Amino acid sequence: GVVDRALGSVRLRVRLQGPGGHAWGDRRLPHPVFALAEGLCRVRALVEGREDASVNASGLEGGQAVNALPQEAACLLEVRALEEAALAALLQGVEAAFAEAARAHRVGLALEVLGRRPAGRTATPRLLQAAERALAEVGERPQWLPGSTDASAAIERGIPALGFGVYRGGGAHTPGEWVLPSSLLEGQRALLALLRGLGVG
């Protein structure tokens, strides 16, 4: 496949804080976990049905004891979009969604940006043609895909770049992730063909 377009992303840590307390005696006090849950549901609604953007939540935590109100609930959040403008708008929507949830539940809110990757495309026609020819040499056709790869660092600086590779595998980021080792040799041949096509080596 060929990643010819950088998928923009912003990674955040979301923290909601309350006073804590006893699960029964302080049951009317603000509850950060329910605030976090509501915020996440609001955020999920922002990308429902969209093909150009996504949101993912992971690393949820909050509380230590089942009979105590947690003082804090937190999660890691990543938003992605194909265009910078869409990414900026989605990020604003995420901030507003959590602000509304925090206000409704009377808890504190802290959003920390952990990292950013820009959306964009810098691959030149020559680079794209070289990738297509290199894949043809190993009997493959290019699958042009957006993605978040190491090429994003070059794209951010305006340097012509793309992500390129050939392998057989599946189940990405799951316990069942797999790759066929012999397919990596095909990928190696394609990479060497790409470098030759660009006059490198």
Explain the meaning of each model-derived region.
Residues D4, R11-R15, G21-G201:
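Metal-dependent amide/peptide-bond hydrolase catalytic core
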